[in-house]
Amino acid sequence: MTDKLIIFDTTLRDGEQSPGASMTRDEKLRIARQLERLKVDVIEAGFAASSNGDFECVKAIAEVVKDSTICSLARANDRDISRAAEALKPANSGRLHLFLATSALHMEKKLRMTPDQVFEQARLSVRFARNLMADIEFSPEDGYRSDPDFLCRVIEAVINEGATTINVPDTVGYAIPELYGNFIRNLRERIPNSDKAVWSVHCHNDLGMAVANSLAGVKIGGARQVECTINGLGERAGNCSLEEVVMAVKTRKDYFGLDIGIDTQQILAASRLVSQTTGFVVQPNKAVVGANAFAHASGIHQDGVLKARDTYEIMRAEDVGWSANKIVLGKLSGRNAFKQRLQELGVAMESETDINNAFIKFKDLADRKSEIFDEDILALVSDESVTHSNEQYGFVSLSQHSETGERPQACVIFTVAGKEVKGESDGNGPVDASLKAIETHVKSGAEMVLYSVNAISGSTESQGEVTVRLQNSGRVVNGVGSDPDIVVASAKAYLSALNKLQSKADRVAAQG
C-alpha cells in the first residue's frame, strides 16, 4: 500500500518574497483558484499578521477556496497566532504555520534569546495555537543548521503540545541531498513521539539543489510533505519547484512508491499564470514547463520520437497541460469557442461580464493578428484580470510619431482615479517618450530597475509581453503588459507597476 505525499504550495507567501514579485489581492485570488484546480493539498495564502493587506488576502482566499487547506504563517507569539486564526475563520480547512529560529546563529544574532528561552516560546506558542485550531505546523527556522540535540528537544516538546506537522527548513539552501535526507531520518529516529506528526521539508535553491534535497528528505528521511512554489519562485535563488518535484514523484513512482493528488494537467496553466502575474519569465529550458521541455532538435531524437515516443520522452507533454494544437482561434471564432478554449486552458473568469470583456479584447486582437495562440489568450485574460475599476491608473490609448533623426513624440491618454488625462512628451525612443508622457501627470519619482520584452508566440505578428520593475522608497514592484504594439505593451506595464506601488503605499499608510 502506497503513502500519499502532501503538496504544500507557498507561492503566495514565500514565492512573493522574490524582489518585484508582490501581487495584488485580486492577483493572489486568481492564483489561489488555479492552485485549487491543480488540487494542491495546502495553500499558504500569506502572513496574516504582517500587514492589513496580507490579513485581507488570507481571509479572502479562505472564503473562496474550499477544496484545499488554507494556511497562514505566524511568528511564535500570541498576537501573530490570533491574527492568523482570525483570518482563517472562513476556511473549510485551516492551518496555522508557526515558525521560530533554532540555529545558534539566529538565536544569538537575530532573536537575542537563549536556547532555553526559545524552547519555552516554541512550546507555549504551539499550546496557544492548538487552543484555536486543530491543524498546527511548526517550523524551526534554519533547522538544518541547528544543533541536532537542541532541535530534537524542541520538536519533541512541540509535538507534545499538539503540533501535527513538523517542517524542517533548509532556510539558506546549504544542504546536500544525502546529508539532508539523513538529517531528517536521524531526527525522526531520535525523537520518541516523531510518529505523532507528519514530517515536512522546505528547501531553498541557493546551490541549485532545492528539488534534489526535497526528494532526498522524502525518500531517505521519510518526509510526507513537500513545501514548494510554482516555477520555483522565491527570494534569492528561489524555492523547490512544485512542477519538478511533482513530476519526479509521479514519473518515478517505481522508486518513491508514493501517491500524489495533483491534477498534473493544470501544471502549465499554473506556471503561465504565475509568470504573467509576476513578470518572471520561465526560462526555455526549464524542466516540465519551459518552452523547450518537450522539444527535440536532434534528427536522431526526432526520428526516435516519431517511431515511439518513449524513446526520448519520459513523460507526455499533454500530462502537464501542453497542447499539441498551437493555433486555436481566429477572427471568425465565436464567443462559445473562446469560452471553451478558456476552460481547456484552465482559466476561470469571475463572471459572464468578465468573459464578455475578454472576448471583446480577443476580437480586437484577432483583427490585428491573423493567428491566435494559447499564449495570446492567456496574456489577454491576464491583462483583463489585473484591470480593475478601483485602480488608480488605467490605460486608454496611445499615439506616437517618430522619424529618422528626430526625437520621437508620444501622447498617452490614461485614467487617474477614474478621470481621463492626456500626457505628451518626447524621448530617446518611442517607449521612453510614452513613459515620460505618463510621468507628466503621475510624477512618481520611481526608478526603473528592469525593462524586458518577451515575444509571446514565435512570429513577427506576436504579441509582446513587457515587464517593468520599479523601485521607490524601498518598495520594488513588477508590472506586466501585453499588446502586438510593444510601445502600448510598455505603457500598460508601466501603469500596472505604478498601480502596485500605489497599492503598497496605501497599505503602509493604513497601518500608520
Curated annotation (Swiss-Prot):
Keyword Manganese: yes
Source taxon at top rank: Bacteria
A GO molecular-function annotation: manganese ion binding
Cofactor(s) required for function per UniProt: Mn(2+)
UniProt keywords, alphabetically: Amino-acid biosynthesis, Branched-chain amino acid biosynthesis, Cytoplasm, Leucine biosynthesis, Manganese, Metal-binding, Transferase
Domain Pyruvate carboxyltransferase: 5-268
Binding, Mn(2+): 14, 202, 204, 239
Regulatory domain: region residues: 394-512
A single GO cellular-component term on record: cytosol
CDD domains given in the database record: DRE_TIM_IPMS (cd07940)
Subcellular location: Cytoplasm
Quaternary assembly: Homodimer.
HAMAP family: LeuA_type1
Functional summary from the UniProt entry: Catalyzes the condensation of the acetyl group of acetyl-CoA with 3-methyl-2-oxobutanoate (2-ketoisovalerate) to form 3-carboxy-3-hydroxy-4-methylpentanoate (2-isopropylmalate).
Protein name: 2-isopropylmalate synthase
